[in-house]
């Protein structure tokens, strides 16, 4: 495990970075960090005793540190990173530090979609069972009050990110892989075949005798799983899903008032009913992956069944902001076409509801590579608003790639008009004029589009309070004769 007097994190407000910073702090290491903007995560770190610098990066921020941690988003000319290298300090990529946690008794959740929800489920299963795991997530989880927690138990639960090849540093005891699709192609030479090979290599790195829990509904994972099974003694492969080859199956998936319910079948034997307080067929698959991992860790099905019944998902995963006057306001991190389809389908499951969607595309490169898939991802949206493309610093626009171009492609496919609105206040005005009782309004994207959901929820609640007050003041006073 890392030995250091003080560790400094550049970009400490990121989900993965804040998780690592919190765990080190809770384990007694002196920690500092910097970020250009304050957030709930930087505030939590400061309250925990982390020395947090907000604003422009400055070499002075690394004073006293003997280890400096950075992420892929940090450019080489960052003054703190440059100073650390110049001073000969130990400099670690985020994934190198995470690898020190994941190369022991660990459960790593990988996949193009569903990592945060699935790893959150695994974390909750082990936490509620009293195993006190160390937890490192890519989203805020209510049960631990953030993204990271240093446990006293042997198990570590974490996300294994494929986006920048980070997961190739890890050697977990258990790997849960949800799916494999084209995404983050800029890190994989634009090749889906290279992404597939990356997942193949990651699974080969599971500790000997460990477990690979793979979603059988994904053809790439079925193929890789069969390859691994043909290499006896390397890793134990278990398939889960709805596919006939799955040992752990979700059957009879159906909605219930709070989310979804399904029959959990293992090796042809009914274990029982699993009820999730979150909607979506994809979440049935996510929970199955978590059940397989929990079973490996020694948990009983009954224990896991009870924990999932009260599961509170990570923030920005079908997060309900308000339900006012029959209008439900939801926010979701969905930013890939497959995630968008699954999220809109989950919203559509609520019978009789019109779906009003607001999508913030992220990255010109993603929009360019997946334009055809995005064009067909919004069939379940009755009303659709697109914002400008949300792009990280340093990414250059690509000619012909814009929200307007995407809107034209979607409109040609659905036959329904698509509004393109850049300003969030203007989006709010549009929604307030458009929505009606019975609607589900859902904001989607990896950027700051959640602020629209928050603003809409506040506006609807304020409108309801004002209307109630007005109707109350209009009642006749006792004895007025009206």
From Swiss-Prot:
Q: Which GO terms describe its molecular function?
A: ATP binding; UDP-N-acetylmuramate-L-alanine ligase activity
Which residues does UniProt assign to the signal peptide? Answer: none
Q: Which SUPFAM superfamilies match?
A: MurCD N-terminal domain (SSF51984), MurD-like peptide ligases, catalytic domain (SSF53623), MurD-like peptide ligases, peptide-binding domain (SSF53244)
Return the EC number: 6.3.2.8
Enzyme class, top EC level, equals ligase
Protein keywords: ATP-binding, Cell cycle, Cell division, Cell shape, Cell wall biogenesis/degradation, Cytoplasm, Ligase, Nucleotide-binding, Peptidoglycan synthesis
Under catalytic activity, the entry for this protein gives: UDP-N-acetyl-alpha-D-muramate + L-alanine + ATP = UDP-N-acetyl-alpha-D-muramoyl-L-alanine + ADP + phosphate + H(+)
List, in alphabetical order, the GO biological process terms annotated in this UniProt record.
cell division; cell wall organization; peptidoglycan biosynthetic process; regulation of cell shape
Q: List the pathway annotation.
A: Cell wall biogenesis; peptidoglycan biosynthesis
Q: Entry's Gene3D superfamilies?
A: Mur ligase, C-terminal domain, Mur-like, catalytic domain, NAD(P)-binding Rossmann-like Domain
Where is ATP bound in this sequence?
111-117
Q: Enumerate the NCBIfam families for this protein.
A: murC
Annotated family: Belongs to the MurCDEF family.
Q: What does this protein do, in the record's words?
A: Cell wall formation.
Q: What is this protein called?
A: UDP-N-acetylmuramate--L-alanine ligase
Q: In the UniProt record, what gene is named as encoding this protein?
A: murC
